[in-house]
Amino acid sequence: MSFDVPAEAYDRFMGVHSRQLAPQLLDLARLSSGDRVLDVGCGPGALTAELVDRLGAGSVAAVDPSESFVAAARARHPGIDVRLGAAEALPYDDGVFDASLAQLVVHLMADPAAGLREMVRVTRRGGVVAACVWDHAGGRTPLGSFWHAVNELGLGARDESHLAGAREGHLVELFKACGLRDIEDTQLVARVEYSSFDEWWEPFGFGVGPAGALFQTLDADQRARVRARCLEFLPPAPFEFVSFAWAARGVV
């Protein structure tokens, strides 16, 4: 999969949905004024922006393995500490944050268990770890129609339903396994309006994430067939895309 893409590509592909989830994840985390918070896998900064609005730039740090996303997050939020790094090896000392959050990231970690253990490590005792992942197993995501079409047409690709946290209860299992306590889980909902089918379809060509990576392997005929099936699955434009994410909160 690839996230070595311009920030604007991610914004159009997934950022429009991420911005809907960010305030809900922060509500679940129940942060307090003065908390020092880390955004793990920050991307171009959808969750980061919400954190800055609520807590101020001086209370927020962010990290991402994509150089282009780190550059974008730094440009958009010049007052915060944004570092290049992977979730599995966070470039911070033990217990330096009051909370560590990961929005739409756990399922994309190379080693989700290790990434969550690192989030626990850098969070103080009594602090909070929270995360959310699309309900890929239920197909209720911005990508559901695409994966449905790909699977129906037998294009030989594995969708994202098997990934960490992408089914009900799995984030809770992962949180328990890394020692978190007082765990809560819930669903988050994102509602995004599209004025045309192509507004939803075209960003797949940007090569973002597993779906975008697969799209780039398809030839012109295969892309046309997937597009035709997606047109049948989705309502006439304009339409609202309603997506669901599983979310969990635990205490260190």
Residue spans for each PLM region:
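A structural alpha-helix within SAM-dependent methyltransferase catalytic domains
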Residues: 26, 49-52, 116-120, 147
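Conserved Class I S-adenosyl-L-methionine
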Residues: 3, 17, 44-46, 163-252
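Class I SAM-dependent methyltransferase SAM/SAH-binding core
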Residues: 36-90, 114
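A short acidic, Gly/Pro-enriched loop at the edge of an enzyme's catalytic core
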Residues: 88-100
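Conserved catalytic/acceptor-binding region of the Class I
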Residues: 113-114, 120-195, 211, 244
